[in-house]
Structures are given as C-alpha cells and as structure tokens.
Amino acid sequence: MYNFLVKKSKCTETDALLIPYFEEKTNIPNQEINNKINIIKKKEQFKGSYGEIFNITRTTEDNIQDIILLGLGKETEITKEKIRRAFGKAVNEIKRLKSKSVFLRFDSVEAIGLENTLKAMVEGLALGSYSFNKYKSDKKEEVEVTVHIGGHNIKEEEIEFCEKVIDEAVLLSETTCLARDLVNEPANNMYPETLAKEVKNIGSKYGFEVEVFDENQIEELKMESFLSVGKGSDNLPRLIVMRYFGDKDNMDQRLALVGKGLTYDSGGYSLKTNAGMVTMKSDMGGAASVIGAISAIAKRNLKINVIAVVAACENLISGHAYKPGDIIGSMAGKTIEILNTDAEGRLTLIDAVTYAIEKEKASEIIDVATLTGAALVSLGEDVTAVITNKDEFYGELREASYETGEKVWQMPSFEDYSKLIKSNIADLKNIGGKYAGTITAGLFIGEFVQNKPWLHLDIAGPAFSEKKGDYCPTGGTGAGVRTLYELANRRCK
C-alpha cells in the first residue's frame, strides 16, 4: 500500500530517494548526487534510457539512503503512459530495497504539464504496487510505503493543487484495484449472490445506491434471455442495479454502464476446453469495470447521473441448462435462436440493456464485456474493440482513453454485418458464424439499444493478463475503470 504526501521535507530523511532522469542532462540541485551520477554515466553504467533503473547507496548524517535513478529516455518522446509504466517498474526496485519511505524528486514535464505528470507518476506507483495474495498461506504482510513528493519546482501555493491531483489519482488506482480484486476472486467464492452482497458493501463505502433483484423478480421482468443462461447453475442469478444521481437538475440525462457479469463460464453445452475454462472467473471483467467506474464517479461527487447494471449468473451444464437449438425470448420481446451456448454474454447483456432503458430511463448506453475471442485475434491483448451507433460518442471515449493510456479501437459496423445475425426461425440468432465475430456480437447487442447513443466495449483482450505488465500483475487488470471515469469527468467540466 502506498501513501502520498506533498511537502517540503528533506530528501535525506527517507529510506530511498527516487529521481526520474532523462537521457539529456537532468537538473539536480544536490552537487553530491550530481557527482555520483556523472561518475556512473562516464562508466556507462547508467544512461537514463527509458525504463532503466540504477541504484546508488549514500550515507547521510544519520541515515543510509538508496538513490534510485529511473530512466525516462528522451524528454521529447515522453508521454503520460510512459511515465505510468516507468513508475510501475520502480515499484519492484522499492520493494527489493525494502524501503518504507521514499522521497520522489518531482519536476513537471513541460510538454505534459504539472497535473498530468504528477497524476501519471502516482498512478504508476499505486497501480504497480497491487498484489492479490489473500489465498496464500505464507503471504507476507503488506508493507506500507510513504512517498514524500517534493522538488524545487513545486511552489508553496501549488501544494494544495498537487494534493487534489494526488487524491484523484489514488482514488482511480484504488477503484481499478477494486475491479482487479473482483475478477481475481475464484468462482467458488465469487458467484452471483456473493457478488451482489459485495456490491452493496462497495455502494455503502463509495456513496451510491444498490438494488438487487432475485430470480423471481428477474422472471417478473420477463428477462428470459438472461435467465436462460443461468438455468444450468445451482447458484441463482442476480440483477444488480447501481444508481448515482449527481445532477438532479437534469434527471432526463442518465448514462447507463452495463457490465457483463458471468461469474463463471464453462461454455455450457458448447463446452470450452479445460485450458479455456481455467481463467473463466474473469468473464465478469465488464461487471468489475462498471462497478469500479461508478465507485470512482460517486466518490468524486461528479455532476452526472449514472446507472450501472450487472446481470450476474453462471453458465454451467445440468439437466436444466439451455441447449443449442433452443429458441428463447427476451425482455424486449424479440426471439433468439441459440446456435452456441458459449455465446452467452450477449444474451445477458441485451436484457440488462433493455432494463436500463425501460426501467431506469437511460438516455445513453455503454456496455462493457469480455465478449469475444475474436477481439483478441483482431486487436491483440492490449486493445479494447469498440462498436458504436454514434461516432461523436466514440470520439468522447477515444479522448478519454488518451488521458488514461487504455487503448481503444473502433470496429466497422456496416449494415451488411447485421444480416449475419438474422435467423430463419426466430428474430435473431446468437452467433453470426466464423467471420467478423467481434462485430456481429456487438451488433447483436445493438439490436436492443432502441436508437439510444451506444458504445459497446469488448475488453476480452485487456481485462485479464497471463503475463505481468509494468503496472499490472497477472490476473485481472481493471481495464476500463479509469477510461469510463474520465469520460464522465470530462462531461462535468
């Protein structure tokens, strides 16, 4: 856990001194440190290349201090995301040195500005320090690290502003890690009922209303599509509705965040392989994303109205489970031919979207889902595939993503693609064939948005990682939380 303070404390009083360093000459007022850096640079032990880390130990009057040099490369090439990644790497060095207090020598990067530089540094450290070890019997106690942020360029009158920037960065990191925790919980502990209970606790903490509908209430709402997916499990489905009204003068404007909430997905009778099932606790990554986003929005008291909806269930096999060849209904009244029970997420989402529009009066929709393997094939592990019916809405998302470093890419949605999901014996079929799988899955949901401005975010790539990143460990990443928050935040300015 990292705590952050802005103050004019002495840099010699901490266990470590963290110095961001560009390849070009970095101005460091302390002559002793400058001399040490010049020596190691002459010996070519450290150049300041991007991501390079070098440690020097020095003795002060009453302390032995580690000086961590963090290479940022060329200043002309630095970005907010590069800063985040570099500081995420620095966490490993701080951990290796067992530092409990760190002085971060802060200088604003002129091209990025004070706010963005500071925010990226804090997010890199806070997100990079995340770990999920609650099930390890020999887990080490979490070390609390205090980061003192200072520098000769921080003016006295800027301290309060810097503290506000840090507060926002810490909150976004916290709610991103909240989403990571939800995804990382094993499915034997995180099933629809326990997820609903957890969301109630989260709502109490962050300041939003939560209402949970049980299976009988869901049936009364005629959400047959959602219920069909969960029929094979003994863990009964739950519809989780979160409400935050920060702009009560404009109650007709309500942004709905709809997250896919498959707490486990075996594929049903269209069964996945064992390897394909191992990580399927992560199939509620969309739900985790919208829960994290509304938590941050509510805690910051943004002037916006947000509804978050999660249709939580498990897709398993039993004598009650739905089958390929079935025809099912939906809350919107449309019928669906089931060709593949592993194309289940879209079936839960369409009822959740219909609920958001008809019962919660949503004026705009963003659905977030770990929906298709095709998104991974087309865009890789780090990019969110996006379908929209309004390019201006996508433009908002794209601008927000530039701020957060979470990559998004708009997929085509030509009218011809919609023909691929038409059924001969029902209104629609739940899979469009082997081509354009990400697009047809998104357009299937688009059939239910009732002409509302809509974004579909397929986070199948970035939501769960099997390799460690610079500021994200293996497992749930919390993809989408910061970008959804940023989109909402920009509307309030």
UniProtKB/Swiss-Prot annotation:
One BP term from GO: proteolysis
Reaction catalyzed: Release of an N-terminal amino acid, Xaa-|-Yaa-, in which Xaa is preferably Leu, but may be other amino acids including Pro although not Arg or Lys, and Yaa may be Pro. Amino acid amides and methyl esters are also readily hydrolyzed, but rates on arylamides are exceedingly low; Release of an N-terminal amino acid, preferentially leucine, but not glutamic or aspartic acids
Record carries keyword Iron: no
Enzyme Commission designation: 3.4.11.1, 3.4.11.10
Localisation per UniProt entry: Cytoplasm
Keyword entries, A-Z: Aminopeptidase, Cytoplasm, Hydrolase, Manganese, Metal-binding, Protease
Cellular compartments per GO CC: cytoplasm
Active site, per annotation: 272, 346
UniProt superkingdom: Bacteria
Residue numbers binding Mn(2+) 2: 260, 265, 283, 344
Pfam hit, one: Peptidase_M17_N
Cofactor note: Binds 2 manganese ions per subunit.
Residues bound to Mn(2+) 1: 265, 342, 344
Cofactor: Mn(2+)
Molecular function per GO: manganese ion binding; metalloaminopeptidase activity
Function summary: Presumably involved in the processing and regular turnover of intracellular proteins. Catalyzes the removal of unsubstituted N-terminal amino acids from various peptides.
Similarity field: Belongs to the peptidase M17 family.
PANTHER family recorded: CYTOSOL AMINOPEPTIDASE, LEUCINE AMINOPEPTIDASE-RELATED
Record's protein name: Probable cytosol aminopeptidase
